[in-house]
Curated annotation (Swiss-Prot):
Transmembrane segments: none annotated. InterPro entries: Asp_de-COase-like_dom_sf, Asp_decarbox. It comes from Gloeothece citriformis (strain PCC 7424) (Cyanothece sp. (strain PCC 7424)). Keywords: Autocatalytic cleavage, Cytoplasm, Decarboxylase, Lyase, Pantothenate biosynthesis, Pyruvate, Schiff base, Zymogen. The gene is panD. Gene3D superfamilies: 2.40.40.20. This is Aspartate 1-decarboxylase. The keyword Cytoplasm applies. It catalyses: L-aspartate + H(+) = beta-alanine + CO2. Heterooctamer of four alpha and four beta subunits. Is synthesized initially as an inactive proenzyme, which is activated by self-cleavage at a specific serine bond to produce a beta-subunit with a hydroxyl group at its C-terminus and an alpha-subunit with a pyruvoyl group at its N-terminus. The active site is at 26 (schiff-base intermediate with substrate), 59 (proton donor). It comes from the Bacteria. One of its GO terms (molecular function) is aspartate 1-decarboxylase activity. It is found in: Cytoplasm.
Length: 156
């Protein structure tokens, strides 16, 4: 059936804390955010700047844990300024027939003004019984920074 790219991780409305033109490249992100959604260091990400509409791709570099750091570096720093809101997406390539048979899972963080977790979602594609399609489900695990009573919360 062929390969498709599906979003597997998203950091929604994270705020740029610094923009460093002098760095060689990438975007530096608090590793606690990366770990929560499953983005790896050096993984390619697509980024949308909600303040100016600019889009770009780069790779991720882990910053200091717990700081909420989101710092575009190098050329990417010219597309952002401190305070801008970004959406950062990571994709994985999957075989379409595999997704129709096994489903797909993505993790999404919606950040607060300090880049802490305001909301956390697990979004899943669940195969239909016929194996010819999928249904989409979005489960909110954290609301307003507080865990909801949900068994999925224990997953990383």
């Amino acid at each position: 059936m062929g390969k498709i790219r599906l979003m597997h991780a998203k950091l929604h409305r994270v705020r740029v804390t610094e923009a460093n033109v002098g760095y060689i490249g990438s975007i530096t992100i608090d590793p606690q955010l990366l770990d929560r959604v499953g983005i790896l260091p050096l993984e390619e990400v697509d980024i949308v700047n909600l303040n100016n509409g600019k889009r770009f791709s780069t790779y991720v570099f882990p910053g200091e844990a717990g700081t909420g750091e989101v710092c575009p570096n190098g050329g990417a720093a010219l597309l952002c300024q401190p305070g801008d809101l970004l959406i950062i997406y990571a994709y994985e390539e999957r075989d379409r027939s595999e997704v129709l048979q096994q489903g797909h899972h993505a993790r999404v963080i919606v950040a607060d003004e300090n880049n802490q977790i305001k909301q956390f979602f697990h979004q899943t594609l669940i195969p239909t019984e016929e194996g010819k399609g999928v249904s989409f489900h979005s489960d909110e695990i954290i609301l307003n920074g507080q865990p909801k009573n949900n068994p999925i919360l224990s997953e990383n």
